[in-house]
């Protein structure tokens, strides 16, 4: 590819309706079972045929496995501790899905 001078590049970007987003800290791509986190990326927005195309480049990449808590686990914690649905779910999330830890945490504060 031939090198382009900055003026030509700027003109081409304007013709293609391209612009770069500044100050982007991270981009998170959420999948069903995990998240891909791209830190300090370069993000370019291209408008083509009425659609916006986001091009993400570079940065550090990190994957996080998404915690999946089953309804059965939430119900079990509710039955064992007498708490409501949201409290049981939150306790399981804080315990990374560990049933025993969630139940102990909720019952430790009880008389």
Curated annotation (Swiss-Prot):
Residues spanning the membrane: none
Keyword Transport: yes
Domain NAC-A/B: 3-69
Coiled coil: none
Record keywords, A-Z: Protein transport, RNA-binding, Transport
Domain of life the protein comes from: Archaea
GO terms of molecular function: RNA binding
Record GO biological process: protein transport
InterPro entries noted in UniProt: NAC-like_UBA, NAC_A/B_dom_sf, NAC_arc, Nas_poly-pep-assoc_cplx_dom, UBA-like_sf
Family the entry assigns: Belongs to the NAC-alpha family.
Assembly mode: Homodimer. Interacts with the ribosome. Binds ribosomal RNA.
UniProt function note: Contacts the emerging nascent chain on the ribosome.
Protein's name according to its UniProt entry: Nascent polypeptide-associated complex protein
Taxonomic lineage of the native organism: Archaea, Methanobacteriati, Methanobacteriota, Thermococci, Thermococcales
